[in-house]
Amino acid sequence: MLVLSRKNNESIMLGKDIEIKILGIEDGKVKLGIEAPKDVEIYRKEIYLEIQEENKAASEQKQDWSQLKGLFTKK
């Protein structure tokens, strides 16, 4: 893990397209601003983990495909 120290209004770059800037430090919390291309998905870690869990649960559900049988018969 790379560990960096940054002061208020300082930034770090991830590659050439993603900038993470320290917007403020208050009451032990750091406020970050992230500039990235629109196709880059950005999530808080706890939200990302919830999405992963939901996707896994959805993929493990058994599906009843019998209702679709009639849609794919040749006429």
Curated annotation (Swiss-Prot):
User: Which InterPro entries does the entry link to?
Assistant: CsrA, CsrA_sf
* BP term (GO), one: negative regulation of translational initiation
**Keywords of this entry:** Bacterial flagellum biogenesis, Cytoplasm, Repressor, RNA-binding, Translation regulation
Q: What does the UniProt entry say about where the protein is found? A: Cytoplasm
Q: Which GO terms describe its molecular function?
A: mRNA 5'-UTR binding
Main location (coarse class): cytoplasm
Q: Name one GO cellular component term.
A: cytosol
Q: Provide the function of this protein.
A: A translational regulator that binds mRNA to regulate translation initiation and/or mRNA stability. Usually binds in the 5'-UTR at or near the Shine-Dalgarno sequence preventing ribosome-binding, thus repressing translation. Its main target seems to be the major flagellin gene, while its function is anatagonized by FliW.
Can you tell me which family this protein belongs to? Belongs to the CsrA/RsmA family.
Query: Can you state the subunit structure given in the record?
Result: Homodimer; the beta-strands of each monomer intercalate to form a hydrophobic core, while the alpha-helices form wings that extend away from the core.
Identification of the protein by name: Translational regulator CsrA
What taxonomic classification does the UniProt entry list for its organism? Bacteria, Bacillati, Bacillota, Clostridia, Peptostreptococcales
